[in-house]
A protein has these predicted regions:
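Domain-length cofactor-binding catalytic modules of enzymes
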Residues: 1-217
């Protein structure tokens, strides 16, 4: 599953239906791919005399080079890994959920369609009549997407409206008012836990020391 803002959550929608939502990705596998090719991109930008200042940490990989094609292949593999990772975890959660519901209610739950969307990737798309690479970081293609809320706040299933200005993209999260460090400095563990209890949120997390990082404040 991973740490940080990754989670598995049982929710209730506006119609009183139970929902399972989880957030995870390619884990260290994807991170290592990104770091490896980011280093290569820095070296290539020095070679090509890139006009982008190195302190911006935005080196590029020309897609018509061997290095660029290798990155695309590895990125797609990481995306496939992330997709399957979420699928496997969701199946395990559904299995446990079904067992417990049947045990305590005698009812076998039925599951509706699933939504599984990527949120860190690049894709070749057509916008404004041009073929361009769209980089989505913490964002999702705005068809049917998921916007998870902070702990104790609402999450949303959304359908894109086809806004060209956003390159047909939706956000993939609630955003932040504070950095993780800033949130821990401003809000105590106790205050976050009191807020969650008041909102009838059960947090099944052994260590609570970092809960302020993802609180709704």
């Amino acid at each position: 599953l991973g740490g940080g803002n990754h989670f598995i959550e049982i929710q209730e929608d506006e119609n009183g239906m139970a929902c399972i939502m989880l957030h995870s990705g390619s884990r260290m596998f994807g991170n290592m791919i990104g770091q490896y090719f980011n280093k290569i991109a820095h070296e290539m930008n020095d070679k090509y005399f890139s006009t982008v200042p190195s302190e911006y940490n935005l080196p590029f990989l020309p897609v018509d080079t061997d290095e660029g094609q290798r990155y695309l292949n590895w990125m797609n593999l990481a995306m496939d890994f992330a997709f399957e990772n979420r699928e496997v975890m969701l199946e395990k959660v559904k299995h446990i959920f079904t067992e417990q519901v049947e045990k305590y209610t005698g009812i076998t739950p039925n599951y509706s369609d699933e939504i599984n969307c990527h949120h860190n990737y690049a894709a070749l798309e057509n916008h404004y009549g041009e073929s361009v690479w769209v980089h989505r970081k913490g964002a999702a293609e705005g068809e049917v997407a998921i916007i998870p809320g902070s702990m104790g706040s609402n999450s949303y299933i959304v359908r894109g409206m086809g806004k060209a200005e956003s390159f047909l993209t939706s956000s993939h999260g609630a955003g932040r008012n504070y950095s993780r460090t800033g949130a821990k400095e401003k809000f105590s563990v106790e205050s976050v836990m009191v807020d969650l209890r008041q909102r009838n949120v059960v947090l099944g997390k052994t260590s609570k020391k970092d809960v302020a990082e993802e609180c709704r404040f």
